[in-house]
Amino acid sequence: MAHKKGVGSSRNGRDSNPKMLGVKRFGGERVQPGTIIVRQRGTKIKPGNNVGLGRDYTIYSLIEGVVTFEQHSRNQKRVSVYATE
């Protein structure tokens, strides 16, 4: 016999809001300083040249330029922004 009454549906019904993670500006796109490039949990993608890393691991542009994604090692991606003349 059950010690507790079956109350499945009334105890469920919680869900968190979407966090809108992912790449916001892709390789080859032009960005301004402060433009968010990637929103992520942890450093799945590492910061490269001319980008900053926020407290929540958001990668953002520090200069005006073009976004490039680089394969740094076999299992590490890096994103940089390079100025265009």
From Swiss-Prot:
Q: Name one Pfam family in it.
A: Ribosomal_L27
Question: Manganese: present as a keyword of the record?
Answer: no
Q: Which Gene3D superfamilies match?
A: 2.40.50.100
Output the GO biological process annotations, alphabetical, semicolon-separated.
translation
Q: Where is this region: Disordered?
A: 1-26
A cellular component annotation (GO) from this entry: cytosolic large ribosomal subunit
InterPro entries registered for this protein in UniProt? Ribosomal_bL27, Ribosomal_bL27_CS
- GO MF annotation, one: structural constituent of ribosome
Keywords for the protein's UniProt record, in alphabetical order: Ribonucleoprotein, Ribosomal protein
PANTHER family reported for this sequence: LARGE RIBOSOMAL SUBUNIT PROTEIN BL27M (PTHR15893:SF0), RIBOSOMAL PROTEIN L27 (PTHR15893)
NCBIfam families named in the record: L27
The family assignment reads: Belongs to the bacterial ribosomal protein bL27 family.
Name the record gives this protein: Large ribosomal subunit protein bL27
Source species of the chain:
Roseiflexus sp. (strain RS-1)
